[in-house]
Regions:
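Ferredoxin-like iron-sulfur electron-transfer modules
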Residues: 145-152, 172-201, 205-223
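Local cysteine-cluster metal-coordination motifs and their immediate loop/turn environment
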Residues: 85-93, 155-168, 190-204, 220-233
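Beta-sheet entry/capping signal
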Residues: 3, 81-82, 213
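Short, amphipathic alpha-helical interaction segments positioned at domain boundaries
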Residues: 2-38
Length: 234
């Protein structure tokens, strides 16, 4: 509901545990998911994704503007904790794809990750907002991550892409790991020049080209908005 409330002891305990063990958890889940994808065992993947979505953090895809608004909201705190560190998926799987330092952690999430990993560095609210705008230019989708399907225990703004991001790949395989945000893209077909840039930038294959004009399948759109700033038809 947009209100700031004190973090409970259980929230902090869960986040501290997950922060310390996230690389190991990601490696195990990545190997397990790959194994069952190879077997084409969709019923098992369905159960696995629901379990992951229940006991592990889940993501809500949002626009960069909403992520920046959230930074402004938490900036009213007496001590605003914001930090940035390595992409945990890249760190855990020892792979690199694009920007490495892009995991923005906030409030008690910032405290937990700074304690667990020396790579995490403090950010001012203005620095965090500038980074989010930079990530948008790179085509990364901002995603609010919260614990235990709470939707309110937000501890991180991940900036995800599809090649290595484990939650994204797990969601593509079985669902129930990432959720669409409150926005969807609206297209004015009269202004579209058919360049196809939005198709290349869309992570969810919501944009397609038909008779030289882009079409948006809004049921597939998760509302990240990364296709908007590069639209040549404006």
């Amino acid at each position: 509901n947009g209100k700031l409330v004190p973090a409970s002891r259980i929230q902090v305990t869960i986040d501290n545990f997950y922060a310390r063990n996230e690389p190991m958890i990601l490696r195990v889940l990545d190997a397990t998911t790959r194994f069952f994808v190879k077997l084409r065992a969709r019923p098992v993947l369905w159960v696995l994704s629901r379990l992951m979505g229940t006991v592990l953090p889940t993501g809500e895809v949002v626009t960069t503007e909403r992520a920046i608004d959230f930074i402004d909201t938490i900036s009213v705190l007496d001590k605003t904790e914001i930090a940035v560190g390595p992409c945990m998926c890249q760190k855990a799987l020892q792979k690199r794809s694009g920007t490495y330092i892009k995991d923005v952690v906030i409030i008690y999430g910032a405290e937990a990750y700074k304690m667990a990993y020396p790579e995490y560095k403090d950010l001012s609210p203005d620095e965090a907002k500038a980074l989010l705008r930079k990530f948008q230019e790179e085509g990364l989708m901002p995603t609010f991550y919260s614990c235990l399907r709470s939707g309110g225990w937000i501890y991180a703004i991940c900036n995800c892409e599809g090649k290595i991001c484990f939650p994204f790949r797990a969601h593509q395989a079985a669902g129930a790991v990432m959720y669409p945000g409150p926005d969807v893209v609206s297209l004015n077909s009269d202004e579209c020049i058919g360049c196809g840039t939005c198709i290349d930038r869309c992570h969810f294959s919501a944009n397609t080209l038909f008779n030289g004009t882009c079409k948006v399948e809004q049921t597939k759109c998760y509302g990240c908005g990364v296709c908007i700033p590069t639209c040549k038809g404006q």
